[in-house]
């Protein structure tokens, strides 16, 4: 009886410790995602219908926002209502002219006006595993006129690596 009670108590205590640790990691990930959404929303609020219609000015506008490239190691792109990339940073990815409407986050932003985090996919132009975060671009009246999508390249160092590099005890780790 005593050994069973002790074992049950130890299992309960270990379960609580693991739950606490997982909760802390989830909070860290949530904060990182929230910060990235705020960055996208801030830039999206500066995108006007006139700017979206002028590719040269739109590209210049995006290049003047280096913070986005710090938040998204795979770059950021402005998408037209049909899902086609109209501007991007960095421009070396050559995504302008590519249609992304088939990507879940892009469809949610353009069709439903929702900001979402996407599932990992293989990047069309980056040719690497990526996931996107997309926010709608709206007129002052609230009409969706485009989208802004930030991409995290999972084959490069990112905010997820910083979280995953933490240790659990002396020899444990985390798989994200």
Annotated model-derived regions:
Residues 1-55, 67-74, 114, 129-133:
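Juxtamembrane extracytoplasmic/periplasmic/luminal helical "stalk" adjacent to the first N-terminal
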Residues 43, 79-90:
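Amphipathic coiled-coil signal-relay and dimerization helices
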Residues 53-72, 91-92, 99-104, 108, ...:
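Solvent-exposed, extracytoplasmic
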Residues 75-83, 173-176:
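Short hydrophobic alpha-helical segments used for membrane anchoring or interfacial signaling
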Residues 79, 138-139:
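Core beta-strand residues in small-molecule sensory/regulatory alpha/beta domains
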Residues 111-118:
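PAS/PAS-like sensory domains
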Residues 115, 127-129, 145-147:
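Short, mixed charged/polar active-site loops
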Residues 119, 127, 134:
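Contiguous mid-protein beta-loop-alpha structural module that forms a pocket-lining wall or clamp
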């Amino acid at each position: 009886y005593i050994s069973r009670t002790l074992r049950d108590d130890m299992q309960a205590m270990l379960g609580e410790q693991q739950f606490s640790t997982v909760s802390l990691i989830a909070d860290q990930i949530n904060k990182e995602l929230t910060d990235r959404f705020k960055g996208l929303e801030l830039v999206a609020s500066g995108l006007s219908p006139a700017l979206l219609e002028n590719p040269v000015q739109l590209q210049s506008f995006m290049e003047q926002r280096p913070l986005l490239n710090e938040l998204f190691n795979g770059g950021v792109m402005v998408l037209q209502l049909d899902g086609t990339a109209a501007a991007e940073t960095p421009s070396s990815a050559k995504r302008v002219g590519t249609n992304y409407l088939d990507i879940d986050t892009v469809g949610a932003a353009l069709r439903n006006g929702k900001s979402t985090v996407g599932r990992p996919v293989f990047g069309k132009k980056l040719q690497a595993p990526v996931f996107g975060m997309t926010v709608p671009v709206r007129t002052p009246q609230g009409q969706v006129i485009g989208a802004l999508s930030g991409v995290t390249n999972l084959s490069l160092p990112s905010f997820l690596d910083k979280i995953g590099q933490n240790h659990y005890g002396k020899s444990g780790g985390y798989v994200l």
